[in-house]
């Protein structure tokens, strides 16, 4: 059998579906739209903490930059020669030794000429 309240041709309005001014009838709290303010102090504290953290990080980066500027770091634009003349002067300052001085070096050497050649990554066992 059909429900008599639904058999009419006009749409029925059930009390649960009534919405007044954007709020359902069931809403018992008239201040529900202001409930977001309930945790406003916690929200403000969180935002303030994030701002302090950002400021701290910014200060750390600034201190790192100042520390780099204080030390004598290699700066290519400042430390490398700028002109070909400077490069040529550096080449002229280099001394090419003759082979006789190399032979003297070998004769005066304290190294063992019979030692095995060193190969990195290979372990040698004393047998």
UniProtKB/Swiss-Prot annotation:
Main location: cytoplasm
Region (Disordered): 1-24
A GO term, aspect molecular function: translation repressor activity
UniProtKB keywords: Cytoplasm, Translation regulation, Ubl conjugation
PTM per Swiss-Prot/TrEMBL: Ubiquitinated, leading to its degradation by the proteasome.
Lineage top rank: taxon: Eukaryota
Ranges annotated as biased composition (Low complexity): 1-15
Region annotation (PABPC1-interacting motif-2 (PAM2)) ranges: 105-120
Family: Belongs to the PAIP2 family.
Domain remarks in the Swiss-Prot or TrEMBL record: Only the PABPC1-interacting motif-1 (PAM1) interferes with the binding of PABPC1 to poly(A) RNA and translation initiation.
Name of the protein described by the UniProt record: Polyadenylate-binding protein-interacting protein 2
Organism name: Gallus gallus
Gene that produces this protein: PAIP2
């Amino acid at each position: 059998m059909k429900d008599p309240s639904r058999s009419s041709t006009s749409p029925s309005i059930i009390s649960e579906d009534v919405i007044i001014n954007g709020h359902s009838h069931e809403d018992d709290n008239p201040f529900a739209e202001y409930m977001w303010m309930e945790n406003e102090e916690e929200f403000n504290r969180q935002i303030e903490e994030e701002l302090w953290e950002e400021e701290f990080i910014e200060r750390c980066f600034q201190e790192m930059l100042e520390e780099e500027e204080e030390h004598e770091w290699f700066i290519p634009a400042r430390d490398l020669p700028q002109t070909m003349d400077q490069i040529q002067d550096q080449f002229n300052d280099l001394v090419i030794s003759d082979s006789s001085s190399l032979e003297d070096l070998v004769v005066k050497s304290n190294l063992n000429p019979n030692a095995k050649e060193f190969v990195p990554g290979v372990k040698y066992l004393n047998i």
